[in-house]
Amino acid sequence: MRKSYRVKKEQDFQTVFDASQSVANRNFVVYRLDKPGQKHFRVGLSVGKKVGNAVMRNQVKRYIRQSITELKPDLLQPVDFLVIARRGANQLTMAETKQNLIHVFKLAKLLKEEADSASE
């Protein structure tokens, strides 16, 4: 993902935390904030020390980034969202990570087909 697709600044993270609702499953928490004037989605990742050592945390972040890249055509565009990994996320394979993210994105209505069916 290019840098323009990332939420990096602490102030941006706080804005999303404060102004949005969270949705969670066993392994991930997602905060979503609609940004109508924005061209595309932006994502912020947070993987705390409870997930594991630095190698495990970086692996979880790589899996999340790869999953989001594969889901990019299906994601709603003018939105900022944060993905927070929970303790069990380091036990997941790449395929399991993607399935868990799809599940939590459906709950957060971040996927296009979910948003279309919710508006009908």
From Swiss-Prot:
GO BP terms: namely: tRNA 5'-leader removal
Q: Which Pfam families match?
A: Ribonuclease_P
List the GO terms this entry assigns under cellular component, sorted alphabetically: ribonuclease P complex
Protein name, UniProt field: Ribonuclease P protein component
Q: Which superkingdom is the protein from?
A: Bacteria
Q: Which UniProt keywords apply?
A: Endonuclease, Hydrolase, Nuclease, RNA-binding, tRNA processing
Instruction: List the InterPro entries hit by this protein, alphabetically.
Output: Ribosomal_Su5_D2-typ_SF, Ribsml_uS5_D2-typ_fold_subgr, RNase_P, RNase_P_CS
Catalytic activity of the protein: Endonucleolytic cleavage of RNA, removing 5'-extranucleotides from tRNA precursor
What the entry lists under PROSITE patterns is as follows: RIBONUCLEASE_P
Give the originating organism: Latilactobacillus sakei subsp. sakei (strain 23K) (Lactobacillus sakei subsp. sakei)
Q: What is the lineage of its organism?
A: Bacteria, Bacillati, Bacillota, Bacilli, Lactobacillales
Q: What does this protein do?
A: RNaseP catalyzes the removal of the 5'-leader sequence from pre-tRNA to produce the mature 5'-terminus. It can also cleave other RNA substrates such as 4.5S RNA. The protein component plays an auxiliary but essential role in vivo by binding to the 5'-leader sequence and broadening the substrate specificity of the ribozyme.
